[in-house]
């Protein structure tokens, strides 16, 4: 019961409202608020009232404008960057080394036989276009050539360029010219790409024939190697004991057994030192070459694939532990016959994350499936971009590219199963839409480590020491008293920390919530002398205004609802005498003038005396409905 009574009182209080009019509320607010200005509006003369009203309105607008500026600045999520440098004991970076040639030519020559013969014939046609090709074309296998041929574009007449097939089938869109030839100065080599049915063809132009034949050979070699089993490809590459001749980390000796092998399609067998997958990460506590990693490599360039690897040297990359080495995009070359010294400075980037920076902690919030997770590596933006491209490749070309990991259940592209894959792949590779889509979907890592390298080189070995160094290395690797190595095939590497080995770049919010509140309060206090309590007072009067408005609207709706069912009077309103008679005719007797049908008076008809006092004031005479009334006791209790 007490709860019900309390709720009833609350209901009556809500129905009654604040008990003030709009004007009374405004006057009360101006008299009681702690904000400067409103009190002067009601206490001064007419002129000062107008002046203070305008000043208060102006400063209130200034405060609102300044608040909008500060809130907009806060919601822009700007960051400030702090930089710190120094030297400390750090984990030595993972070092990935590869050979420029992915395979030994002696082991893949049987796979590339037809392609190499075709390549030699192409070079002959480019270098000697007037020579006879009848004997050459008879022994060539044109199966590969027919899928993606090279053509010559005769641009001696810019208005009517002529497209010529290298092996005799000359054609032009308007004027065929069989047997036409042109020299290298007047022609450009291009690659013709056609769809499966041959109805749609495009030409990919190059500024140099070297670029054209290299890209064409790599494209055809990709088709061949994509059909070879992965374990067979590993066997065709360079073995670790053949490429890694010597290893020293600080004062501790190491060997090829301290390297983790990984197959990278562009460079074949690669080897990673200090990757941290199965072994403990090695630290480095001192700067200088004596405390770093020293390697001697044999790249064996005498066994390079002639048309596949045109660069001789070692390809290497420094990266963080448990990350996949994207050595094609981020690696560097070390030249054969030199000693290359690499001083390392570690940049640690610590981004703030959403909403300040569009980055990800581990890639879990990225829509692209990371295909490199099969290597148990961490997320990187390169892994996301490559996975995104492979996803587009599968959706548009129905097959995956040989250079990227393959999702489960899919097949690599090749000319036999997917005849127009090259046309689809090169169109997708040049698509701006595809690149923009992948860039918009992939995010940078919030915590990233980059290695800045200072590189210096010198000839190694020197002429004076070349003989004995090559003898020793040949004896250690091949147990031969003769020199089996060449200066053109060996590379020496020194990788070490510099004097300052780390630099931390950290983001922090430029504007936090404390900054926002202090600026909002400062502007309000400066222009109007207010505080948080003044805002609460203003909020209170706004609530009262809304309260009064709602009560008035409810009362107006109720009044309209009551008036609608009442029918208008058919005659004139009753007089006072008739109203009094209604209260005095207790027996509900008929009128004295009423008669029977034949003029006879009713026998029980009586004339009652008219009272001398007015009728009592019963509740039934109230003009206001009961549901809007409340007792005096309830009002006093509230």
Swiss-Prot record:
Q: Which residues span the membrane?
A: 51-71, 531-551
Task: Give each disulfide bond as a residue pair.
Answer: 98-270, 182-187, 194-201, 247-254, 359-446, 384-442, 388-438, 397-424, 399-413
Catalysed reactions, semicolon-separated: Na(+)(in) = Na(+)(out)
A GO-annotated cellular component: cytoplasmic vesicle membrane
Provide the activity regulation entry from the record: Originally identified and characterized by its inhibition by the diuretic drug amiloride.
Q: Null phenotype?
A: Scnn1b homozygous knockout mice die within two days of birth, likely due to hyperkalemia. Serum sodium levels are reduced, while serum potassium is significantly elevated. Urine electrolytes show lower potassium and higher sodium concentrations in null mice. These mice do not exhibit defective lung liquid clearance, nor do they die from respiratory failure, with only a slight increase in lung wet weight observed.
Classify the protein's membrane topology as the record does.
Answer: Multi-pass membrane protein
Query: What about PTM?
Result: Ubiquitinated. Can be ubiquitinated at multiple sites and undergo monoubiquitination and polyubiquitination. Ubiquitination by NEDD4 or NEDD4L inhibits the ENaC channel through endocytosis, intracellular retention and degradation of its individual subunits. However, some studies could not confirm the ubiquitination of this subunit of the ENaC.
Please list the tissues where expression of this protein has been recorded. Lung and kidney.
- Which stretches face the Cytoplasmic side? 1-50, 552-638
User: What positions does the record give for glycosylation?
Assistant: 135, 141, 205
* Residues annotated with Phosphoserine modification: 631, 633
Q: What molecular function does GO assign, one term?
A: sodium channel activity
Where is the stretch described as Disordered? 594-620
What keyword terms does UniProt attach to this protein? Cell membrane, Cytoplasmic vesicle, Disulfide bond, Glycoprotein, Ion channel, Ion transport, Membrane, Phosphoprotein, Sodium, Sodium channel, Sodium transport, Transmembrane, Transmembrane helix, Transport, Ubl conjugation
Its subcellular locations are:
Apical cell membrane; Cytoplasmic vesicle membrane
Q: What positions carry the motif PY motif?
A: 614-618
Asked if the keyword Manganese belongs to this entry, the reply reads no
Q: How does it assemble?
A: Component of the heterotrimeric epithelial sodium channel (ENaC) composed of an alpha/SCNN1A, a beta/SCNN1B and a gamma/SCNN1G subunit. Interacts with WWP1 (via WW domains). Interacts with WWP2 (via WW domains); inhibits the channel. Interacts with the full-length immature form of PCSK9 (pro-PCSK9). Interacts (N-glycosylated) with BPIFA1; the interaction is direct and inhibits the proteolytic processing of SCNN1A and SCNN1G and the activation of ENaC.
Similarity remark: Belongs to the amiloride-sensitive sodium channel (TC 1.A.6) family. SCNN1B subfamily.
Task: State its role.
Answer: This is one of the three pore-forming subunits of the heterotrimeric epithelial sodium channel (ENaC), a critical regulator of sodium balance and fluid homeostasis. ENaC operates in epithelial tissues, where it mediates the electrodiffusion of sodium ions from extracellular fluid through the apical membrane of cells, with water following osmotically. It plays a key role in maintaining sodium homeostasis through electrogenic sodium reabsorption in the kidneys. This subunit is not essential for ENaC function in airway surface liquid homeostasis and proper mucus clearance.
Q: What is this protein called?
A: Epithelial sodium channel subunit beta
> What organism does this protein naturally occur in?
Mus musculus (Mouse)
